């Protein structure tokens, strides 16, 4: 066998043990990954994290889509490499500062490598023609798509983790709502001036009241104390007043966590518009434009703008409280409305966050791919310092979006006109099942009590036995024959007898049994519903 072909043996020239070992490793790794995802999905279901289970299903769908793309690239590699285009068309819109000689040298190198592998360059047979994409470039593109999917899922998981970490201290604020101090603060009999409340003083200070400076204050506030205790408690009270009863025991913190999980299953996916954004960035990556440099700052601008807008929403709610009344009763109450958000659409904020995460993952995946692929580092990183700045901006953007903007979004967007009813579906079903179970248990107890009461009535007042008693026979017995006859008179009806054995318990039981059972069951059921505690399950 020739020495030049020793490193490029085909399958018939490869030992069977080598083929078996490689196949076994690939199969075992794939099965382990599939089994791990399956167990993770079951763990989410057991922990009653339906939204996280849906997010995991979305990740599985992304992996399946990635598998389809990989399959298409593998199958279409040979046909695409046979699509020939003129060299003049191949020399425009290049991403690198490479001249015609460098391109031809690289093409010649590709032809030599393909020829050494036992193949040949189909388009080299034609004068002035080159392949649309060579087999090597398609292989590199294949790797980039895989790296992009991995980075996007990783960034979304990091975003969820940092967001939950930021929201941990909100749980302490939620627990304080059961304290006497908080109940005194929201006491309806307590009157205060609106401008003296902590919420209004925080958001309507000297600089916050100036129209031109409000946006500047909101911009810097997102970095320093984006959400405070007074903000959380005020928006919590406004949400409860708008969508629930004021005295309901509602865990607003758990609701926000479930809402964040529900949004996570949207963020973790790569929709068709996002794929088009990625394709557009690849198209605009032309040498001389510096597309990958200046476009890396676009997600940063979007995140800063979104954070500023969310802070402005809080300021607008504080302004409406002050404009509505001079004196407030109890706690200041905000009125949720979609008018605070862009185009009356709170979900647009989530779209911008989704776009930011995808674009940031795209930038980092492109950096890692070009640095790790031989021959691409010199092309895409001519100025290494600009590339380092790009990486620093990407990492800072990820921390800012995950730890500040995403939790702020989860809280402020609850001030929209509508609440997420999909989150309540599971909780409503649980509440109805618990209510049904308690109602059936109480009905069994009532039936047993009614049966015992009926039995006590039967034993305490036996009408048939009393009518056959000798005492009653003696009352109706006629006078003896030796007694003097008495004048015939019309007998008056006997006075009603008093029972010598009064049974007040039996009378009470008789009064209880006089009520229709349906009315008694409905009254008890209505009381159960009114006293029920509609709160989220503590099992997390």
UniProtKB/Swiss-Prot annotation:
Annotated keywords: Calmodulin-binding, Membrane, Pathogenesis-related protein, Plant defense, Transmembrane, Transmembrane helix
GO biological processes: defense response
Keyword Flavoprotein part of the UniProt annotation: no
UniProt cross-references to InterPro entries, sorted A to Z: Mlo (IPR004326)
GO cellular component term, pick one: membrane
Top-level taxon of origin: Eukaryota
Entry keyword Transmembrane helix: yes
Extracellular topological intervals: 1-16, 82-142, 287, 369-383
Topology with respect to the bilayer: Multi-pass membrane protein
TM helices/strands, residue ranges: 17-37, 61-81, 143-163, 266-286, 288-308, 348-368, 384-404
GO molecular function terms noted in the UniProt entry: calmodulin binding
Biological role: May be involved in modulation of pathogen defense and leaf cell death. Activity seems to be regulated by Ca(2+)-dependent calmodulin binding and seems not to require heterotrimeric G proteins.
Family according to the record: Belongs to the MLO family.
PANTHER family in the cross-refs: MLO PROTEIN HOMOLOG 1 (PTHR31942:SF82), MLO-LIKE PROTEIN 1 (PTHR31942)
Name this protein carries in UniProt: MLO protein homolog 1
Organism lineage string: Eukaryota, Viridiplantae, Streptophyta, Embryophyta, Tracheophyta
Gene name, Swiss-Prot/TrEMBL: MLO1
């Amino acid at each position: 066998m020739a020495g030049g072909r020793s490193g490029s043996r085909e399958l018939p020239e490869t030992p069977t043990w080598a083929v078996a070992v490689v196949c076994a490793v690939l199969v075992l790794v794939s099965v382990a990954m599939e089994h791990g995802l399956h167990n993770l999905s079951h763990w989410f279901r057991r922990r009653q994290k339906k939204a996280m289970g849906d997010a995991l299903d979305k990740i599985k769908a992304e992996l399946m889509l990635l598998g389809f793309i990989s399959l298409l690239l593998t199958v279409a590699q040979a046909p695409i490499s046979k699509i020939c285009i003129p060299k003049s068309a191949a020399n425009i819109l290049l991403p690198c500062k490479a001249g015609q000689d460098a391109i031809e040298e690289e093409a010649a190198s590709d032809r030599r490598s393909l020829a050494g592998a036992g193949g040949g360059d189909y388009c080299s047979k034609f004068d002035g023609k080159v392949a649309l994409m060579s087999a090597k470039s398609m292989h590199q593109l294949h790797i980039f798509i895989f790296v992009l999917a991995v980075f996007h899922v990783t960034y979304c998981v990091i975003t969820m983790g940092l967001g939950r970490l930021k929201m941990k201290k909100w749980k302490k604020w939620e627990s304080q709502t059961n304290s006497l101090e908080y109940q005194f603060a929201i006491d309806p009999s307590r009157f205060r001036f609106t401008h003296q409340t902590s919420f209004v003083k925080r958001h309507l200070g000297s600089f916050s009241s100036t129209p031109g400076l409000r946006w500047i204050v909101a911009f810097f506030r997102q970095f320093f104390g984006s959400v405070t205790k007074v903000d959380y408690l005020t928006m919590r009270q406004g949400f409860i007043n708008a969508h629930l009863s004021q005295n309901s025991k509602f865990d607003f913190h758990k609701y926000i966590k479930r809402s964040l999980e529900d949004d996570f299953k949207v963020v973790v996916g790569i929709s068709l518009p996002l794929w088009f954004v990625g394709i557009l960035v690849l198209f605009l990556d032309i040498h001389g434009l510096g597309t990958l440099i200046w476009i890396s700052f676009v997600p940063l601008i979007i995140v800063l703008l979104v954070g500023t807008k969310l802070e402005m929403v809080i300021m607008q709610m504080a302004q409406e409280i002050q404009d509505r009344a001079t004196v407030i009763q109890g706690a200041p109450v905000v009125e949720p409305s979609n008018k605070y958000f862009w185009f009356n659409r709170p979900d647009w904020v989530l779209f911008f966050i989704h776009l930011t995460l995808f674009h940031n993952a795209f930038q980092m995946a492109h950096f890692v791919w070009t640095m790790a692929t031989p021959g691409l580092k010199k092309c895409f990183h001519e100025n290494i310092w600009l590339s380092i700045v790009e990486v620093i901006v990407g990492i800072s953007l990820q921390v800012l979006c995950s730890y500040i903007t995403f939790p702020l979004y989860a809280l402020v967007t609850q001030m929209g006109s509508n609440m997420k009813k999909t989150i309540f579906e599971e909780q409503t079903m649980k509440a109805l099942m618990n209510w049904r179970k308690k109602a059936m248990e109480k009905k069994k107890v009532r039936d047993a009590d009614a049966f015992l009461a009926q039995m006590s009535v039967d034993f305490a007042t036996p009408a048939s036995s009393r009518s056959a008693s000798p005492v009653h026979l003696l009352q109706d017995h006629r006078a003896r024959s030796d007694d003097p006859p008495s004048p015939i008179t019309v007998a008056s009806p006997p006075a009603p007898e008093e029972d010598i054995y009064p049974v007040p318990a039996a009378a009470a039981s008789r009064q209880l049994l006089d009520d229709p059972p349906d009315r008694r069951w409905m009254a008890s059921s209505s009381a159960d519903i009114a006293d029920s505690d509609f709160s989220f399950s503590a099992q997390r």
